[in-house]
Amino acid sequence: MAMILEHVNYSYGVGTGKEFHALKDINLQIGDHEFIGLVGHSGSGKSTLIQLMNGLLRATEGTIYWDGQDIYDKSFSMRSLRGQVGLVFQYPEYQLFAESVIADVEYGPRNLGWSNLDVEYRSYEALKQVGIGENLLDVSPLSLSGGQKRRVAIAGVLAMAPKLLILDEPMAGLDPSGREEMLTLLSKLYEERQISIVLVSHNMDDVAKYADRIL
């Protein structure tokens, strides 16, 4: 697995007369089993960059490669990319919507066209890995604590078996103990799943202890 960004630019409002250059000439390579910290102040373009990496935004200029393929090539499957490059947005608990925890986690892998057996197995395993017990599978995700909701949201992305997991400010709004628990969880996922992780934060202290390199 590798993601390569070559001379990537992104501008908002192109052609409106109010164009804003969010990213300029970004060159980046992410290899197998890397833990990368993406650190910067608010408005520095961190969220824009990770949406480009997941295919939610299209670069104004430049090229992005995933496993050697140009993601903007007509033959490339963006659906496949979004399964392999998992993106957990900031405050992901606000995006929970299903009637039960297990149904919420199963939603993503079902949309990838997997068999019911695969969907159920991967969803149960993902929930187990983030510390959500079987006693919570059938309850409404809205009845969970804030920390549990966030874990369920992360499980929903993990259930799609991503090779690259990107998290946008996953410690936002958590108290010190919650922040440490989240970082410990991410470190565990990194080792057990042998995936690459991009951890977005404005706080250097959050990432310095765990990241292999910081951007």
Where are these regions (language model features)?
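The feature captures the beta-strand-to-loop junction immediately N-terminal to the Walker
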Residues: 39-41
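Conserved ABC ATPase "signature" region
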Residues: 117-135
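Helix-to-loop junction immediately C-terminal to a conserved catalytic motif
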Residues: 54
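Conserved ABC ATPase signature
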Residues: 140-144, 148
